[in-house]
């Protein structure tokens, strides 16, 4: 058996958390449920005002989150976005206060790539010493912007053991890159991953990458998992991206002729943010349960064993 650690991402339950005033589902509910389900760690989106799914921004709240994961024997990762130094220094300290060992980020610069690359290198070089001092690993995600080779170029230039890569199973589709090409380029740097499933569809708003329950899309999720394991990855994170939708950023003529870019059923188009609150919550629960079951089944079929003790 191939031993791994298995995290789950709070994006999977984003509507439960967003509408917590009515669902009663907060970060502590999430931590408790995912521990009971057998995950060995939790990832929490902490973007924006109030730190989103973290559900609080005080020192007391951070301490309570730290205690909640420790009591259940879980590892914790936090997500932020925007590599600017002010944000990164703050979020590294938040991660450390919460007991997180990893902080994910991606760039939010709205500028030509020739400018964004050196700015991102500058930012990550500047914050790396603080992250190292506080024991927080920084991971830069291929998040709808950089191709695999560009991300590898950035991390090569940063040249810090405290700054690695997060590989997303499907985000390269938005920039017209086959996920395996992105994986090959990023492989020497990958420390964390987001496991999800997508289809590419035509919509009235243009070509879109559509999130679907795990196992219902066109991503080669089993082979991707095997390739990542062979590259040394031992911590995987399941992310339910049902009803996620993002535009394809390149002309369709430039899309690779690989199976994950075969056009899917336009009827799958769904933007969860446009659904009524109750419907979003109910359908998210079904998608999460079905997708998580498919993910666990895929792992078992391919010889993976989730270990309760930390693997990496």
Task: List the predicted regions and their residue ranges.
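Charged helix-capping and loop-helix junction motifs
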Residues: 22-26, 57-64, 89, 93, ...
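Catalytic domains of carbohydrate-active enzymes, especially glycoside hydrolases
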Residues: 25-48, 98-102
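Active-site-proximal loop/turn and secondary-structure-junction residues that shape catalytic pockets
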Residues: 12-14, 46-48, 82-84, 107-111, ...
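Glycine-rich, proline-tolerant flexible connector loops at the mouths of alpha/beta enzymes
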Residues: 40-67, 111-112
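Active-site acidic/histidine proton-transfer and metal-coordination neighborhood
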Residues: 32, 60-164
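Conserved beta-strand positions in the central sheet of alpha/beta enzyme cores
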Residues: 43, 77-78, 103-104, 194, ...
């Amino acid at each position: 058996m191939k031993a791994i650690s298995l995290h789950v991402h709070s994006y999977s339950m984003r509507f439960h958390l967003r509408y917590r005033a009515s669902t009663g589902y907060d970060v502590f509910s999430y931590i408790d449920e995912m521990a009971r389900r057998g995950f060995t760690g939790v990832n929490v989106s902490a973007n924006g005002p109030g730190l989103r799914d973290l559900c609080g921004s005080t020192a007391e709240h951070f301490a309570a989150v730290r205690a909640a994961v420790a009591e259940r024997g879980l590892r914790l990762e936090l997500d932020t976005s925007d590599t600017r130094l002010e944000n990164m220094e703050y979020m590294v300290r938040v991660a450390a206060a919460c007991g997180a060992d990893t902080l994910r980020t991606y760039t939010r610069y709205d500028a030509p790539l020739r400018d964004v690359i050196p700015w991102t290198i500058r930012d990550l070089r500047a914050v790396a010493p603080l992250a190292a001092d506080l024991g927080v690993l920084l991971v830069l995600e291929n998040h709808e912007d950089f191709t695999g080779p560009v991300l590898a170029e950035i991390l090569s230039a940063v040249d810090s053991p405290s700054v690695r890569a997060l590989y997303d199973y499907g985000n390269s589709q938005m920039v017209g890159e086959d996920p395996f090409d992105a994986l090959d380029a990023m492989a020497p740097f990958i420390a964390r991953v987001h496991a999800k499933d997508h289809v590419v569809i035509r919509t009235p708003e243009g070509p879109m990458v559509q999130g679907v329950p795990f196992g219902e899309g066109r991503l080669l999720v089993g082979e991707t998992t095997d390739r990542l394991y062979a590259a040394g990855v031992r911590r995987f994170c399941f992310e339910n991206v049902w009803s996620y939708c993002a535009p394809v950023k390149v002309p369709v003529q430039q899309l690779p002729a690989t199976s994950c870019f075969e056009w899917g059923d336009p009827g799958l188009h769904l933007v969860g943010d446009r659904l009524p609150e109750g419907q979003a919550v109910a359908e998210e629960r079904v998608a999460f349960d079905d997708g998580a079951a498919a993910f666990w089944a895929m792992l078992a079929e391919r010889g993976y064993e989730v270990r309760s003790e930390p693997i990496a």
